[in-house]
Amino acid sequence: MKMSEQLSDRYNPADVESRTYEWWEKNGYFKAQDQSTKPPFSIILPPPNVTGFLHMGHALDHTIQDMMIRWKRMNGYNTMWLPGTDHAGIATQSVVERELKKDGVTRHDLGREKFVEKVWDWKHQYGNRIYGQMRRLGDSCDWDRAVFTLDEGVSKAVRKVFVSLHKKGLIYRGQRLVNWSGPLETAISDLEVEHKQIKGSLYHVKYPLEDGSGFLVVATTRPETMLGDSAVCVHPEDERYKHLIGKNVLLPLTNRKIKIIADTYVDKEFGSGVVKITPAHDFNDYKIGKTHNLEFINILTKKAEINENGGVYAGLKVQEARKRILEDLKAQDLLEKEEPHVHSVGHCSRSGAVVEPYLSEQWFVKMEALAVPAKRVAENGTIRFEPESWTKVYLHWLNNIEDWCISRQLWWGHRIPVWYCEDCNHQTVAETDVTACEKCGSTKLHQDDDVLDTWFSSALWPFSTMGWPNETETLKTFYPTSYLVTGHDIIFFWVARMIMMGLEFQRDVPFRTVYIHGLVRDSQGRKMSKSLGNSIDPVEMIEKHGADALRFTFAAHLYSGKDFKFSEQRLEGYRNFMNKVWNAARFALSNLSDFKAPTEGVKALPNKVHISVFDQWIITKLEEVTKTVEEAMEQERFSDASTALYQFIWNQFCDWYIEFTKPILNGNNAEEKAATQLVIAQVLNRIMRLLHPFAPFISEEIYQKLPIKGTACIVDQYPNARNDKEFLSLGSAQAALEIDIVKEVITAIRNIRGENRISPAVKLNVRLGVTNDQTQKILGNNRTALMTMGRLENMEIGPEGDMMKCAVAPVVVKDASVKVIIPLEGLVDFDEEVKRINKSIEKLTRDIGMLSGKLSNEKFVANADEEVVAADRALLAQSKVQLDSLRDALTRFQ
């Protein structure tokens, strides 16, 4: 990498990021080796849609994966992060159809072959733009291995799996109820159904009894579907209707006879306790229809309009039919009442139209047999979910699994490998294109028009991306993969199906660990969406604040499986952290200009005779944070790891250590200065390596400027206490205690200055009240640091003495106790201070009363978020301490 002699005055993320990423790629640091003596660690990237742009969910997902890959790479693993994109059948076809519509052309005008060519043209032009955005984030993928779900190799795998499952009787064609999008004229998956709360109506319709003795009232939100009713249903133990079970009612407006049946599915308490059963247009009714052997009457066309079974309403759109039917019911006095009703209605995420449960001929996978081994590997711990609570959710779904509809009425995707003979009607299922019927030899064949659900090819992703069905070295080395990172919304659509397919075709699980993260929400906790206008573009955030700041924001708020409230204000805070790191490195490097890099490099040790207590202290703190980060990363506690690093770098290294060492670096003791310079160089080296998985760009840039470094931070060893014993042994628990006492005393002095609004330019007189000889010695040994950093005129160490008209702050560090006493005579107006303190006491007393009342309310404690309750309790405790302190001050000032 082309490096300047020193770090620039200001940190410019855009300059550093583009240059650094290009250098990493050029040097092949992301590449995995199919054959290596290093232990393998692999992650398969959940393939984003080829139509997509990087969104906040991706950015979080990718940050977690890249942190793990970089951490494992630095720990000596042969890492492979394999990227890819999904052809996204419905999404991509919809995008291209919208483009054609601008020219007044439909896909049907073009025909299938030319339309698919258009989609490929679009894919070649726009399909890889998300890769560029992933690079902006810092994704260290092995780009040479990138795969597309319609690549030839994946297509080969898809066909092989289809044929194999079909031979085993696990794939079949049948008529079942599916989610149907009328505008798209295709079945869609549950994931493509968005449920919205709709303010509608509940219509109470009279169904006349066949014998003319009265009627039953049925409540429905969709009166138009009554055209497909096969029965009305009551609870078998409902005394109101027991005598009617087995009799008939006349379907309103048509007078078609339908039976009154009984089933425990019915809720006796809802509405009238009578429900209409429409097996061809409701998923619950479908099951009842199967149980009671009812007629399945489809009343919709593929465009979701009323078909010929709708009689006089045929040809109407659903909403038009509803309006007409309601008018006719009123005219015949068959509508008892209409009342407002809010209910959930499924909408197609692509077209926006209401999703219709629709009876159609589709291809399905039998899931029950495939689910058995998939349950076993979760139960016996072969696969681990993090957080563990998701294991129960996964198992619950598998225990209630239904067959999977895998066919879609689209043109873009993996076409179903089934050919129909026009002469003998035989079906040929094959891995390669068929030219003649395997039964009669006829060449009059046509391939099934449907394509496979996108999730079908995605289910094979962990092994199809590695070259299967060929026995490749990649497959031998990296399957099963080590880690899967994903959101909880696709556990069933993708994770479970990958596990099933991996066990079926590789006889092993596809991954060992499934890390489930929460959703990225806005600052108010709302889900990000276009309709709310609260979506945030991660690329825009990167351009404003830098990729490292965004990554660190995610890492610092990654609590096990919980949703994350994102705000730009938080991001700005971590941008400030990056600036802090940059400026600290600039200061340190400016004081290393005359430092001669030792030939031993990272193994070089300072002279123990000349090492300062401050050096010993920072090394002790470095050991602590190294152990904390290592343990947290091993347990996937990314927030704990990043927060510990943040606190060490900002608080210990930048705010304290650098300030402590300034007198040494500017002093005349050459031996002590040389020792401190070496410690600074070594600690900075380790900080950059510790920081790298979280903030790769800034850490690499600074690392390359260090006098002690390897080839590249990205491939240097990640710090751990076991391999760094010699350097870390220079730390000292006693030194750590000493400096912690000194820090707390300085902090107390600064707090008193701030609380009493005393200018930093005014040097203070301080008395440190202490009786313990050892503590007196510690304070005496660090007089220079206390005087300089406390901005003191004079400092006495000894008995407490008179504390009237003084500010007092107690300091306790382990067994050491110090009272910081600062005379305020001539520095503050005591009358004004007494007024201010009294006002503060009044306010705190009110606040404490409100908080106490809130926390004594059992309903609030039971229903509020745990974090809110904990925060209120902490605030109450803090407020009580502040109140005691103010009362003490009031006594001294009066």
UniProtKB/Swiss-Prot annotation:
Q: Which GO terms describe its cellular component?
A: cytosol
The coiled-coil segments of this chain are 827-852
Matches recorded under Pfam families: Anticodon_1, tRNA-synt_1, Val_tRNA-synt_C
Q: Where in the cell is it found?
A: Cytoplasm
Q: GO molecular-function annotation terms?
A: aminoacyl-tRNA deacylase activity; ATP binding; valine-tRNA ligase activity
Question: Motif 'KMSKS' region: where?
Answer: 527-531
The EC designation for this entry is: 6.1.1.9
Give the source's domain of life in one word: Bacteria
Q: Which UniProt keywords apply?
A: Aminoacyl-tRNA synthetase, ATP-binding, Coiled coil, Cytoplasm, Ligase, Nucleotide-binding, Protein biosynthesis
Please indicate if the UniProt record lists Nucleotide-binding as a keyword: yes
Q: Give the comment on domains.
A: ValRS has two distinct active sites: one for aminoacylation and one for editing. The misactivated threonine is translocated from the active site to the editing site.
- How does the record describe its quaternary structure? Monomer.
Tell me, what does this protein do in biology? Catalyzes the attachment of valine to tRNA(Val). As ValRS can inadvertently accommodate and process structurally similar amino acids such as threonine, to avoid such errors, it has a 'posttransfer' editing activity that hydrolyzes mischarged Thr-tRNA(Val) in a tRNA-dependent manner.
Name-wise, this protein is: Valine--tRNA ligase
Q: Identify the species of origin.
A: Bdellovibrio bacteriovorus (strain ATCC 15356 / DSM 50701 / NCIMB 9529 / HD100)
